[in-house]
């Protein structure tokens, strides 16, 4: 393959390698995994004992982490255990060469891996028991999206085809996209590939959000994955969206960036926020480097999936009531992660769902200041998404189990189901809700992307393409239990362009309520699978 300097792709990484100045505190991985970060350490300890055992996750990057037993240069360092490494879809050459671009890519990939699976006692990763498969795509003279798709597909087939989440901590340039007048409209080849693979391989793709001066935003225009912005430490917690993130909203002279740095049609770009500023991370040389960026926020989310999936598999093996194989679905993971994210700190009375932090955006505004809180047509905040990742709250959300709308449902839970065109599913909450308490509800579903499979082998091959079949329009309502008219709902999320709907709203008065999932408009098929997660407060 012809090679070239990785100017565009390494712009993403070089920005992520900013070394903190003396006046800025640097933080070991233990801080971002602790209560000040995503609160995953609590899940590592009794009685939870969740470290991602037997759960396979993946990482696609420009480089790959070195693997003990494959690369001689890491014989003395085993703190970042990698289950399998690949170059695109083949075994890599052992003992990666030490030219500068390869070294940078290797270090970046190892630091991303460290966030997920590091076993170092002072810098333990989010899911040190998980099985990580990693693929590097290498240096390409042109747009590398086809090879990146091949690598992602190959990872999705590892572990017997059972990978629960795949991390992407790099971006592709719109300028190198071969489409004429390419824009962030969801139809770049890599973006379509991820949305196709999410459905076909049932894997959650976690994508590092756009940052810095932008310029490498593909595949943040995906529909079926999760895009991650990064937070910085503020008053002792990771609770402020870093100014280096590129969000969704552009106004004034910056409207020229719509479609280039943010999605067309005001579709939300950021799903969730995770720690990523001034982290001290490990490489397999035993070196610790201070890094910042969405590259290191995204793997916090990917590895949290491994913790949740270990719990889910434990429940399935014990045949626990309210647990089915739906617990493994990527849509369920997306709904659970987004619905349990921190927005505004609870005052100790539980009315704000036990949230542990006030997340702040530009100008110190919080989620209640956002257009997403005020407008039913905007499900997520442009900077903050649904809020800040909290692994323990995600566990609480997930551990409540799956509940069918066939009978009244508890205050906390999730479901995976289908809804027919022009129909709806009503989830009636069994207990009255407390006046003044917040309700959080998240609905997720997939855009349909199909493979133009010229040779009929059901796999993407170089030279093939994808077809966008569109996005069915689902809406979400919180309504009085006896009401049937959605115009009388107390809160709604009715975006016409997003594949996520989200409600976060205070209950106006104590009473019985229900959640409605409504199929508003069909783009392709008669039924639409979806995942739903809800968190409410029963009356006292």
Name each region found by the language model.
Residues 2-14:
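Bacterial N-terminal signal peptides that target proteins for export
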Residues 13-23:
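Bacterial N-terminal signal peptides
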Residues 31-33, 42-147, 160-165, 175-177, ...:
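Subtilisin-like serine protease catalytic core
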Residues 61, 218-310:
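Extracellular S/T/G-rich loop segment that most often corresponds to the catalytic His/Ser-adjacent loop
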Residues 119, 137-225, 230, 235, ...:
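Substrate-binding/access-modulating region of protease and related hydrolase catalytic domains
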Residues 137, 273-367:
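Hydrolase catalytic cores
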Residues 329-330, 334, 339, 425-429, ...:
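C-terminal edge strands of extracellular/lumenal beta-sandwich accessory domains
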Residues 354-472, 531-540:
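Secreted peptidase-domain scaffold signal
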């Amino acid at each position: 393959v012809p090679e070239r300097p990785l100017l565009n792709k390494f712009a993403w990484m070089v920005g992520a390698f900013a070394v903190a100045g003396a006046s800025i505190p640097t933080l070991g991985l233990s801080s971002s995994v602790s209560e000040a970060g995503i609160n995953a350490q609590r899940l590592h300890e009794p009685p939870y004992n969740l470290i991602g055992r037997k759960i396979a996750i993946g990482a696609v990057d420009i480089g790959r982490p070195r693997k003990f037993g494959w690369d001689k240069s890491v014989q003395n360092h085993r703190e970042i255990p990698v289950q399998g490494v690949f170059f695109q879809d083949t075994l890599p050459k052992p003992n990666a060469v030490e030219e500068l671009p390869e070294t940078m890519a290797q270090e970046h990939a190892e630091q991303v891996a460290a966030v997920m699976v590091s076993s170092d006692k002072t810098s333990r990763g989010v899911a040190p028991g998980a099985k990580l498969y990693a693929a590097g795509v290498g240096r390409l003279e042109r747009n590398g999206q086809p090879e990146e798709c091949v690598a992602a597909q190959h990872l999705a087939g590892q572990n017997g085809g059972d990978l629960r989440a795949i991390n992407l901590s790099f971006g592709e340039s719109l300028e190198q996209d071969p489409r004429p007048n390419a824009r962030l409209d969801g139809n770049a080849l890599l973006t379509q590939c991820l949305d196709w693979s999410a459905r076909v391989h049932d894997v959650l793709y976690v994508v590092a959000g756009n940052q810095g001066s932008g310029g490498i935003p593909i595949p943040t225009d995906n529909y079926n994955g999760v895009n991650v912005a990064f937070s910085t430490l503020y008053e002792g917690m990771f609770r402020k969206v870093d100014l280096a993130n590129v969000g969704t909203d552009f106004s004034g002279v910056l409207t020229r960036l719509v479609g280039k740095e943010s999605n067309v049609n005001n579709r939300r770009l950021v799903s969730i926020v995770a720690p990523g500023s001034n982290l001290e991370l490990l490489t397999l040389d035993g070196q610790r480097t201070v890094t910042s960026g969405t590259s290191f926020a995204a793997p916090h989310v990917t590895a949290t999936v491994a913790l949740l999936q270990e719990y889910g598999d434990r429940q399935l093996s014990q045949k626990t009531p309210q647990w089915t194989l739906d617990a493994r679905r990527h849509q369920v993971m997306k709904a659970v992660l987004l619905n349990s994210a921190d927005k505004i700190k609870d005052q100790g009375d539980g009315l704000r769902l036990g949230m542990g932090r006030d997340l702040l955006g530009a100008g110190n505004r919080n989620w209640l200041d956002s257009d997403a809180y005020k407008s039913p047509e905007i499900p997520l905040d442009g900077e903050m998404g649904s809020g800040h990742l909290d692994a323990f709250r995600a566990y609480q959300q997930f551990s409540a189990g799956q509940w069918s709308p066939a009978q009244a449902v508890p205050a906390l839970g999730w479901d995976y189901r289908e809804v027919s065109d022009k129909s709806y599913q009503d989830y009636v909450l069994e207990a009255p809700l407390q006046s003044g308490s917040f309700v959080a509800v998240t609905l997720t579903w997939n855009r349909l992307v199909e493979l133009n499979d010229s040779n009929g082998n059901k796999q993407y091959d170089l030279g093939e393409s994808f077809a966008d079949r569109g996005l069915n329009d689902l809406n979400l309502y919180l309504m009085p239990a006896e009401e049937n008219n959605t115009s009388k709902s107390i809160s709604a999320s009715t975006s016409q362009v997003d594949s996520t709907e989200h409600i976060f709203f205070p209950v106006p008065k104590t009473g019985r309520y229900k959640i409605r999932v409504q199929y508003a408009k069909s783009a392709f098929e008669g039924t639409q699978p979806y995942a739903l997660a809800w968190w409410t407060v029963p009356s006292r």
